[in-house]
Amino acid sequence: MLSAAASAIPRLRWAAPPRNQSARNQWLLLRRRSLSSSPPYVTPGIPAAAAAAGSGALEPPDLPRLANAARISLSPEEAEEFAPKIRQVVDWFGQLQAVDLESVEPSLRAGTAAGNSLREDRPETFTNRDAIIESVPSYDDPYIKVPRVLNKE
C-alpha cells in the first residue's frame, strides 16, 4: 500500500513515440502530391528549380556523405571507382520519375484487390503423421531432433 506522500506525487508518463505511417499510406500521400509541387526526390540543399532543370534526372548523392552514413571509409581510388556505378543506379531510379501513375489503382499487392486475400488462419490436422516420423532421421517421442543451427560454444 502506498503512503499518502507517495500517492500525492504525480506520476510521469512517457510520451509515446510518433507512430510511423504504413507504407500504403505513405504511397498514397506521395501519389496525391501534384507533379507541379516540389518533387519528393529533391535532396536537401539543392533548390527545387535546379532539380527540375535537370530534365527529371536525380542528382547523384555526395559520395563522402553517403559513405559516412553507411559507416564505411572509402579511399579516393575507391570513390573514383564507385562514383560512376552509383551515378548509373541513380539514373535508373531517375527513369522511374517518368512513369505515369495517375491511371494506376492503389493495391496492397500486384494483381489483388485492396482487401484481405489471405486465407483464415485455423489449425488443420495432418492425417499422415506416421509418414513424416518415418522420414525423420532422429525421433524421440514426441520430439523430432534436428542438428544444432547456432554454434554456441
From Swiss-Prot:
GO terms for biological process: glutaminyl-tRNAGln biosynthesis via transamidation; mitochondrial translation; regulation of translational fidelity. Transmembrane segments: none annotated. GO terms for molecular function: ATP binding; glutaminyl-tRNA synthase (glutamine-hydrolyzing) activity. Its EC number is 6.3.5.-. It is an enzyme of class 6 (ligase). The keyword Phosphoprotein does not apply. Keywords: ATP-binding, Chloroplast, Ligase, Mitochondrion, Nucleotide-binding, Plastid, Protein biosynthesis. It catalyses: L-glutamyl-tRNA(Gln) + L-glutamine + ATP + H2O = L-glutaminyl-tRNA(Gln) + L-glutamate + ADP + phosphate + H(+). Pfam families: GatC. One of its GO terms (cellular component) is glutamyl-tRNA(Gln) amidotransferase complex. The keyword Nucleotide-binding applies. InterPro entries: Asp/Glu-ADT_sf_sub_c, GatC. It is found in: Mitochondrion; Plastid, Chloroplast. HAMAP family: GatC. Belongs to the GatC family. NCBIfam families: gatC. Allows the formation of correctly charged Gln-tRNA(Gln) through the transamidation of misacylated Glu-tRNA(Gln) in chloroplasts and mitochondria. The reaction takes place in the presence of glutamine and ATP through an activated gamma-phospho-Glu-tRNA(Gln). Subunit of the heterotrimeric GatCAB amidotransferase (AdT) complex, composed of A, B and C subunits. This protein may be expected to contain an N-terminal transit peptide but none has been predicted. This is Glutamyl-tRNA(Gln) amidotransferase subunit C, chloroplastic/mitochondrial. It comes from Oryza sativa subsp. indica (Rice).
